[in-house]
């Protein structure tokens, strides 16, 4: 009798995706973050569902409904902080996952990579709208500042902003629609994840060398299921340490003050995972220019396959580009720091220099170093 795992129409799909999947024998721990992102998404959907049972998307009751969840609902505080800090874990895993793809040249899987870029935009949109829901000061002013950026679009800008707001300011209509979108988007993300995996399994996983690994494959289960399980335990340990000991470490104290349209907080800033993009936005004095730079700072990932000049896929054996890569990582950390600082000297100039170097490294220096390395190896024509 043949195994049901290999014959049942539904179980067969799971088998080919997570059990009998041929995987390269040499993929390192940097490949663990895909499964961790899946876990983060599941945590967010489950905790979010329970929060939605008690939350009310009305300007008069939103803030107090979140307070009610934390004070009166059984383990409501735990669910709320797991959801809030789960988003931070999601973005940590996301940045490492993208960084891994950039380092080892995974962007040459064009379809998988482009779906990934779309996923990044969708996750960022979801996180932004989720931050608005508690209706604290930073929620309100963050929503006002970021949605207002769309008014920089010529001709249709103002109309577009008022259409998104559902009025002439961020108000009840805005909160209600943000809640609706925040609820539906994770399910769209889950569908996109399936497409992401579908395209990935067409080609198979990349590996640290960037070379074809068809000659040396091992089954996903038990080798990588056990390896992923270690990552899962470490993620849960890190998340629960954050939730149970430092729940507000990554949040903003201003969000414990109910939203007040008549009182602007001294420093409006988004959550930490958006600070790098926020710093790039602020470093350009022109409004439209800032918005374009903001979008391009993420969209630039979609251009990586076209900026690849080397005959080698991975950076494993490319020391010059390796140095540039880690300069880019350091640069992003500087941008994240600057995004949280007030707009004054010396932060303005540091932010502008970091923004210039961010685009320069990706668009100019890395493609040039790829050509130089090929020449040094006498591989160029």
From Swiss-Prot:
Keyword presence, Nucleus: no
Membrane-spanning intervals of the chain: 33-53, 77-98, 113-133, 178-198, 226-246, 288-308, 320-340, 347-367
Pfam entry (one): Cytochrome_B
CDD domains for the chain: cytochrome_b_C (cd00290), Cytochrome_b_N (cd00284)
Binding site for a ubiquinone: 201
Positions of disulphide bridges: none
GO BP: mitochondrial electron transport, ubiquinol to cytochrome c
Location(s), subcellular: Mitochondrion inner membrane
Membrane topology: Multi-pass membrane protein
Sample GO molecular function, one term: ubiquinol-cytochrome-c reductase activity
Cofactor: heme b
PROSITE patterns: CYTB_CTER, CYTB_NTER
InterPro entries: Cyt_b/b6_C, Cyt_b/b6_C_sf, Cyt_b/b6_N, Cytb/b6-like_sf, Cytochrome_b, Cytochrome_b_C_euk/bac, Cytochrome_b_N_euk/bac, Di-haem_cyt_TM
Main location: mitochondrion
Entry's Gene Ontology cellular component terms: mitochondrial inner membrane; respiratory chain complex III
Keyword list, A-Z: Electron transport, Heme, Iron, Membrane, Metal-binding, Mitochondrion, Mitochondrion inner membrane, Respiratory chain, Transmembrane, Transmembrane helix, Transport, Ubiquinone
Stretch forming the signal peptide: none
Residues reported to bind heme b b562: 83, 182
Family classification: Belongs to the cytochrome b family.
Summary of subunit composition and partner proteins: The cytochrome bc1 complex contains 11 subunits: 3 respiratory subunits (MT-CYB, CYC1 and UQCRFS1), 2 core proteins (UQCRC1 and UQCRC2) and 6 low-molecular weight proteins (UQCRH/QCR6, UQCRB/QCR7, UQCRQ/QCR8, UQCR10/QCR9, UQCR11/QCR10 and a cleavage product of UQCRFS1). This cytochrome bc1 complex then forms a dimer.
Reported function: Component of the ubiquinol-cytochrome c reductase complex (complex III or cytochrome b-c1 complex) that is part of the mitochondrial respiratory chain. The b-c1 complex mediates electron transfer from ubiquinol to cytochrome c. Contributes to the generation of a proton gradient across the mitochondrial membrane that is then used for ATP synthesis.
Note: Heme 1 (or BL or b562) is low-potential and absorbs at about 562 nm, and heme 2 (or BH or b566) is high-potential and absorbs at about 566 nm.
Protein name: Cytochrome b
Organism of origin: Apomys musculus
């Amino acid at each position: 009798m043949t195994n049901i795992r290999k014959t049942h129409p539904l179980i067969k799909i799971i088998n080919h995706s997570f059990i009998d999947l041929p995987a390269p024998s040499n993929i390192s721990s940097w490949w663990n973050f895909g499964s961790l992102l899946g876990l983060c998404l599941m945590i967010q959907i489950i905790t979010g569902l329970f929060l939605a049972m008690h939350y009310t998307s009305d300007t008069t009751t939103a803030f107090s409904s979140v307070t009610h969840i934390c004070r009166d609902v059984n383990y409501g505080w735990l669910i709320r902080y797991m959801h809030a800090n789960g988003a931070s874990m999601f973005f940590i895993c996301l940045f490492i996952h993208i960084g891994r793809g950039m380092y080892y040249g995974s962007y040459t899987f064009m379809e998988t990579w482009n779906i990934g870029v779309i996923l990044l935009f969708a996750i960022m949109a979801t996180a932004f709208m989720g931050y608005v829901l508690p209706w604290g000061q930073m929620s309100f002013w963050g929503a006002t500042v970021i949605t207002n950026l769309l008014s920089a679009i010529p001709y249709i800008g103002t109309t577009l902003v008022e259409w998104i707001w559902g009025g002439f300011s961020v108000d009840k209509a805005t909160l209600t629609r943000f809640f609706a979108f925040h609820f539906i988007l994770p399910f769209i993300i889950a569908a996109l994840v399936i497409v992401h995996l579908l395209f990935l399994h067409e080609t198979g996983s990349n590996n640290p060398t960037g070379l074809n690994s068809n000659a040396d494959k091992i089954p996903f289960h038990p080798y990588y299921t056990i390896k992923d399980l270690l990552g899962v335990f470490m993620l849960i340990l890190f998340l629960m340490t954050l939730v149970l000991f430092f729940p507000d470490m990554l949040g903003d104290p201003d969000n414990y003050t109910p939203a007040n349209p008549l009182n602007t907080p001294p420093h409006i800033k988004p959550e930490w995972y958006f600070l790098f993009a926020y710093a790039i936005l602020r470093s350009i004095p022109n409004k439209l220019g800032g918005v374009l730079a903001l979008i391009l700072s993420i969209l630039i990932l979609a251009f990586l396959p076209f900026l690849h000049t080397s005959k080698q896929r991975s950076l494993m054996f490319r020391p010059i580009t390796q140095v540039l890569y880690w300069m880019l990582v350091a640069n992003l950390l500087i941008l994240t720091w600057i995004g949280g600082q007030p707009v004054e000297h010396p932060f303005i100039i540091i932010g502008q220099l970091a923004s210039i170097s961010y685009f320069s490294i990706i668009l100019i220096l890395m493609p040039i170093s790829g050509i130089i390395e090929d020449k040094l190896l006498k591989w160029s024509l």
